[in-house]
């Protein structure tokens, strides 16, 4: 069974890495797991923190719990150094794969994997995942349409993992619904045979409580706070919860 403290196979860089270092411990202390931290230019600057329960689920209340816990910490540490939107979200159906348990849970489904270190001159792979090795060192992937004479299944070294995420397919959507994950959002295609999501289905959400303001600037001459107010971006119309469709369209895809 996956544990909250299971280490990730990937890490962020730059500002995202500083945010991850600050929030990972508090998130684990709440019984959740940090998945990824992403910084984007949406609405000026958006800090997106993906989190989940060890079983892979995450609902509105859980997102709000995480947001309330880490917001004061981020305000104190100020890793961004400017105004930004804090967005807490679940990983989504086409989720990133960042732990060995993620690969175990989604064995048999299509994924895109990019290695940080080339393997036989190649870094990017797309195929059906197998079950990781017992020691968690490698994960097999079945490659479609390989050239004659080349192996159709190879073992990818997880120590060299750069990025990985599931590919959004009808089979994946059906299985996500069966496991109690969120239904697809507006703009996502679903096979009609998959059926509609139950009314009590936990929605795939983002929780955006409010824009975060930068710390007041100090007057170098007087060593006093500047009287000039610092403006933060206005929040989106419609409240703090928005759908995930936009993120699916804007996600950096692996080829």
UniProtKB/Swiss-Prot annotation:
Regions of compositional bias (Acidic residues) in chain numbering: 186-202
SUPFAM superfamilies per record: YhbC-like, C-terminal domain, YhbC-like, N-terminal domain
Any one GO BP annotation for this protein: translation
Compartment list: Cytoplasm
GO CC terms: cytosol
Predominant location: cytoplasm
Pfam family, one: RimP_N
Annotated keywords: Cytoplasm, Ribosome biogenesis
Entry-linked Gene3D superfamilies: RimP-like superfamily, N-terminal (3.30.300.70)
Family statement: Belongs to the RimP family.
Identification of the protein by name: Ribosome maturation factor RimP
Organism annotation: Methylorubrum populi (strain ATCC BAA-705 / NCIMB 13946 / BJ001) (Methylobacterium populi)
Taxonomic lineage: Bacteria, Pseudomonadati, Pseudomonadota, Alphaproteobacteria, Hyphomicrobiales
Gene this chain is encoded by: rimP
């Amino acid at each position: 069974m996956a544990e909250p403290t299971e280490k990730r196979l990937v890490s962020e860089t730059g500002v995202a890495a500083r945010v991850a270092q600050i929030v990972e411990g508090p998130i684990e202390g709440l019984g959740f797991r940090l998945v990824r931290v992403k910084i984007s230019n949406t609405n000026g600057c958006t800090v997106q923190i993906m989190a989940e329960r060890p079983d892979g689920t995450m609902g509105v209340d859980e997102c709000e719990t995480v947001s309330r816990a880490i917001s004061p910490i981020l305000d104190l540490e100020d890793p961004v150094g400017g105004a930004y939107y804090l967005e807490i979200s679940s990983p989504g159906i086409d989720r990133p794969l960042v732990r060995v348990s993620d690969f175990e849970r989604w064995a048999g489904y299509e994924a895109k994997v990019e290695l940080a270190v080339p393997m036989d001159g190649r870094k990017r792979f797309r195929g059906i995942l197998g079950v990781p090795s017992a020691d968690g060192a490698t994960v097999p992937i079945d490659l479609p349409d390989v050239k004659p004479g080349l192996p159709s299944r190879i073992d990818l070294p997880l120590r060299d993992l750069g990025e990985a995420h599931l590919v959004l397919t009808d089979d994946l959507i059906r299985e996500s619904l069966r496991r109690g994950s969120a239904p697809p959002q507006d703009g996502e295609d679903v096979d009609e045979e998959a059926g509609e999501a139950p009314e009590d289905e936990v929605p795939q959400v983002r929780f955006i409580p409010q824009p975060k303001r930068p710390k007041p600037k100090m007057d170098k001459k007087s060593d006093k706070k500047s009287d000039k107010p610092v403006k933060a971006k206005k929040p989106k119309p419609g409240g703090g919860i928005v759908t995930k469709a936009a993120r699916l369209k804007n996600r950096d895809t692996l080829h």
